[in-house]
Amino acid sequence: MASIQSSIAQAAAAPGQRFLAATGPTILQVLPALQTGGVERGACDMAAAIMDAGWRAIVASAGGPMTRELERAGALHLAMPLASKNPLVVWRNAARLEAAIRRWNVDIVHARSRAPAWSARWAARRLRVPLVTTFHGTYNAGGALKHGYNAVMTGADRVIAISDFIAEHVRAEYGCPDERIRVIPRGVDIRSFDPDAVSHERVIALARSWRIADGAPVVMLPGRLTRWKGQGVLIDAVARLGRKDIQVVLVGADQGRTAYRAELEQRVLRHGLEGIVRIVDHCADMPAAYMLSDVVVSASTDPEAFGRVVAEAGAMGRPVIVSGHGGAREIVVDGVTGWLTPPADAEALAARLGEAIALPPGTRQEMSRQAIAHVRARFTREAMCAATLDVYAELLAARDAPGPA
């Protein structure tokens, strides 16, 4: 254990003054790495909220570009090889986490992914520290072995589901009891995703970069290039729509899926949509991208666990057309803030696209107002963080409650 303690000391950056001055409980979040993504975003948002509450936030991961964000918030990062699924490494990570829990007097461990959850569970159980997990996806079972591997996410004192859809999946697939499940939707940063915070200059610069024709209605589908995100369905829908005056932008990198990208490009050519549909690998200013768009589409053919794009578009007051399944459908009030369409139905999507593009200005303005109000009432980062802090407080109260006399 001494060598593990030494490695933990070397893996941690020197804690900052804000961390050392905090007097509240210590929360250790555990995830594979700090690359860009929903899991990482949630961990960083929670670390900042924990510090703002006067508590102490620690994040253990293999590191990545978002580590700097943690440090700016005053949180402590512990570098561990938590992205590995190698059973031996997972076992050693349990010892590393146990040492970290002891050293920093951790009150709650919060695991956000499966392999790290195994390590976190072993460490937390050995030291009788409450464990929280967040179920970020459906984690397709694919057999008894995979099902058992996934089930670690339901073996916590509290299981956070990021949508009602995920909560029902956890109940049905893993038999997790209701009393341990808490539904906490992911939250949007409404300071960044605020129509009033995006200047005309930012929108104009993006339009020039994307070579959008003046006055052309813009349809955008954000999402990495993978088949289930439904880019092909949208291309087919645009072909059925038959309008040549619109611009369709697929925003997302192929992440090595070059064959799928080539397939999409061929589909565009086959439909004669070159000059209308384009693929943009990356967008560094998504708030401006939403403002540039007249319609935002989420055409996923498999259910989304939550639907971040739908919530962000709503926060920006953009009409959304969404596949009517999974967590994404929970974000849309059909016919009020956007529309639901049958998954993988290009004909139905084409009809909704035509309706959305042709919205009268007054109707569009009212839909925008309703969408913004709906997201701000239910899907903000602040609400997500406050609800998660409540889960922590609930577990701490149970831990500290006097036992029977």
Name the predicted role of every residue range.
Residues P319-V322, V332:
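Short hydrophobic beta-strand element within catalytic cores of glycosyltransferases
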Residues A111-A117, F135:
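Short His-centered aromatic/hydrophobic patch
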Residues E355, G362-R378, A387-D390:
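A short, well-ordered alpha-helix in the C-terminal region of glycosyltransferases
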Residues S61-P65, V188, P222, Q247-E263:
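Glycosyltransferase donor-sugar binding loop
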Residues R125, L131-I162, E168, G175:
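A conserved, positively charged/aromatic
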Residues V333-G335, W339-E347, G354-P361:
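Conserved acidic donor-binding segment of nucleotide-sugar-dependent glycosyltransferases
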Residues G256-R261, L273-C283, A289, W339-L340:
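Active-site donor-binding acidic/aromatic loop of nucleotide-activated sugar
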Residues G37-D45, P217, L221-R240, A262, ...:
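A conserved mid-protein helix/loop that constitutes part of the nucleotide-sugar donor-binding site
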